[in-house]
């Protein structure tokens, strides 16, 4: 049947049904929620049931467990996560029925088409920076739409359709999909060697992709670049777009001065381009989070948010799920009282930043880390760096690698990593074969007063929550 489009206001009515394959993923669920709010009939499928799928179902989405060709019948468009294989039965059925298939990033680009887009890219810090930017713009009365790769705790969601003209979203470089976006502002937090498997194991191709990302800006667009990162600083010198820099360097346009850590908070002086200085107390620990806050402050300043309002947003920021998420204290079966922090960090540079934040905030505590490596390829590519940074903690428990769909790689598993750490002579790692057994092993390692960091991008976060809810007994459901 040929459908008639009378005007742009009829788009939802003309093509109302959108189906998401892999709807439970952080990037997918956020887009699905925005489209639900726009009035689309949203359905989706996922192999797992999680907080995101339950929230979407409560909001009115039709969510199916598992993948089946029948799930896409009657839909007008299929949105697919990059984690989904081409032979997925829903994709095969959509092709046979000639239903349009949109990659996740392409649908995000469609949403951005109807707003003024701010895209936050970088190997590390995207989620926190995007969340802080959304908080600053919200505090400034701009009511932005946001799509974030983690749960913004104040909103209880990772996405919201705002009434304002700005949309702020993460731009995912991991698979090159950020090159589908056409924002008005582009942030680059840092550039590091990660996801090399998607770039032919060639770091130069990652560098080139970020350069191309800035080329997606219109001639009147703005690049917001962290010049404390050497790779980003090099890019700033050769990008043919307007550039505004941020960082702790003296030549940064937006910079932090007199930075000190006060427990779980950071205090600094925010210096803006016209010379205005404002004291800031950031409700997040670590110098890396100061840089994330500077990017958000630069965005706010560009859009006319007052310095005092920026500072208030940063001080009142409630945090993001699994980004140095202080879950509180719990008592082990041996009577030790420990503080548990859950964090998504899974790259050596992220681990180093989180360890520094933990030691800066709790210098008198022993730092105990439970780490679940993420992907065999990353463990192989960053093996020496992982061994170096993990050997700096007071006690370490390693679970087996979370494969994320990868086949095992010889010499890139947790036992090999433990041997490399042990050879450095600074710690004696404990290796747990199954992540479900982690909670029962930890009491043998923990002492009273310890700070326990639960880290990784896999399912270790469920173990952290299980420990808070049930103690160090049993296995996560």
Curated annotation (Swiss-Prot):
Cell wall formation. It catalyses: UDP-N-acetyl-alpha-D-muramate + L-alanine + ATP = UDP-N-acetyl-alpha-D-muramoyl-L-alanine + ADP + phosphate + H(+). GO terms for biological process: cell division; cell wall organization; peptidoglycan biosynthetic process; regulation of cell shape. One of its GO terms (molecular function) is ATP binding. This is UDP-N-acetylmuramate--L-alanine ligase. ATP binds at residues 122-128. Its main location: cytoplasm. It comes from Xanthomonas oryzae pv. oryzae (strain KACC10331 / KXO85). Belongs to the MurCDEF family. Transmembrane segments: none annotated. Pathway: Cell wall biogenesis; peptidoglycan biosynthesis. It is found in: Cytoplasm. Keywords: ATP-binding, Cell cycle, Cell division, Cell shape, Cell wall biogenesis/degradation, Cytoplasm, Ligase, Nucleotide-binding, Peptidoglycan synthesis. InterPro entries: Mur-like_cat_sf, Mur_ligase_C, Mur_ligase_C_dom_sf, Mur_ligase_cen, Mur_ligase_N, MurCDEF_pg_biosynth, UDP-N-AcMur_Ala_ligase_MurC. The gene is murC. Its EC number is 6.3.2.8. It is an enzyme of class 6 (ligase).
